[in-house]
A protein has these predicted regions:
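C-terminus-biased signal that marks the final domain/tail of proteins
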Residues: 1-270
């Protein structure tokens, strides 16, 4: 069901796929909803589909926030949602009614999430710049992703090991702050969650722009390092430094990426 819902979102409701004979065909996503809901296991949906458009980091992140909204499995509309359209069903997932056992569907976004992320490997950038992990903590539906360059050499305080744990609260921990927000939303979901989502979208869209700006600054520093190395005949050793934790050739690039990653992660506490 979760795969069907993700496909449904990314294809705008139309599954385009190879029929196994080399032919690309398109079918309404709802042609397979009975399979997704477990009513017709013989009506197998395709293993993969072609998205309606190029998939962005934001697209993937938003899929991970899904609770089947707008589908027959929409968890905000059945009796289990209560009076505040809560799209969560607490464990255990099954229940009995009139002698029959029923099971609540598992959504993509879920309350027991510790952390979540979207990895972005950008081959059109040098290795020292191209890797990004958009990282978040607690429930994906009520937390935002912050960009962390993979060459960052310092851990933000909010993600630091030892800054709180599962049983020890810390008001400087990303997990605990997001956990507070999430639990507040669970009490009045239809009132609070839309406001939180608005703030999430604003932050993530802003960072998409800032990442591009930061990339350009990092590229300038990278080119300066490469030009300087070439003049000194040290291009090979510089190439090694790209992936070395101790390499100094790209120290300016790494410092820039680290500062941006750490400062951005800490913005939630401002």
């Amino acid at each position: 069901a979760r795969v069907w819902s993700a496909f449904n979102i990314l294809s705008n409701g139309w599954f385009t796929f190879d029929d196994g004979n080399g032919n690309m065909i398109t079918k309404d996503a709802y042609a397979y909803v009975d399979y997704a809901m477990g009513h017709n296991p013989e009506n197998r949906m395709p293993l993969w589909i072609k998205p309606a458009k190029k998939v962005t980091v934001k697209n993937v992140a938003d899929v991970m926030r899904d609770h089947y909204e707008g589908t027959p499995m929409d968890m905000t509309t059945d009796i289990g949602a209560g009076g505040n359209a809560l799209p969560y069903r607490w464990r255990p997932m099954d229940f009995e009614y009139n002698g029959k056992t029923y099971t609540n569907e598992r959504a993509i976004a879920t309350q027991q999430t510790g952390f979540w992320f979207v990895g972005q490997s950008r081959g059109d950038f040098p290795d020292v710049i191209g890797g990004l992990i958009w990282f978040g903590t607690d429930d994906a539906a009520t937390s935002y992703l912050t960009p962390i360059y993979t060459n960052t050499n310092r851990v933000p305080e909010c993600f630091r090991e030892g800054n709180g744990n599962l049983l020890t609260y810390s008001n400087t921990s990303s997990f605990w702050i997001n956990n507070r927000i999430t639990n507040a939303c669970y009490r009045m979901y239809n009132i609070m969650a839309p406001y939180v989502r608005e703030r999430i979208d604003a932050f993530e869209n802003e960072q998409m722009v800032k990442v591009r700006e930061n990339d350009n600054k990092a590229l300038d520093l990278f080119k300066q390092a490469m030009d300087g190395a070439e003049k000194k005949g040290k291009k090979a050793s510089v190439a090694y430094d790209v992936m070395s934790d101790t390499g100094s050739s790209f120290s300016a690039v790494k410092s820039l990426l680290t500062k941006y990653s750490v400062d951005t992660a800490q913005e939630m506490f401002k």
